[in-house]
Amino acid sequence: GTIGSEYSDASSTLALSVRNRYWCRELIRRAGLKEDIWPALSESWQVAGSVQESAARETGLSRKTRVIFGAGDSAAQLTGNGVIEPGVTACNIGTASQIAAVVDSPLYDRQMRLQTWCHTAGDKWYIQGGTLNGGSTLGWLKKKILKDSRPYSDLDREASLAPAGSEGLLFIPFLAGERTPFMDPYARG
């Protein structure tokens, strides 16, 4: 097969000019990295090739089945949810959580509180702030603090009885470092 990548996923390497959608050769050289290891880039929807012989045997897929580049997880989620135009924002709460908004041109936050990524819509970008610990904090609470084996639905029902604002309780979900509004792998709440 041919090795390649697409712009939304390549945005996370810090070696991509997100604005111009090409590898920053000068940055790559300054970092002392080999220039020939960076794959050709394509749009998410473009055909990367077809199913390899070995994969066809293992899966039963035809060798004529085309393989598409795809997208990074957040870009795919935004596209799948129809978040493809400026003015539309999405909130994703999974193990980690993100808030993302589509923009017409890249935005750069010098304090690195937000990140800019290439969107699957070729002439768009998205800005995103994410926390490493979203829904995963519920598992931590259940196991470490409550030591409770009841189903989450029971805990949800109980939590719904608490007043809005939880009587001033503030939880900072830094259980495994943090990404935004600041990057700190050692942050703890």
Where are the language model's segments positioned?
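Active-site core segments that coordinate phosphate-bearing ligands/cofactors
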Residues: 1-5, 9, 13-32, 53-189
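Glycine-rich phosphate-binding loops at beta-strand->alpha-helix junctions
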Residues: 43-51, 71
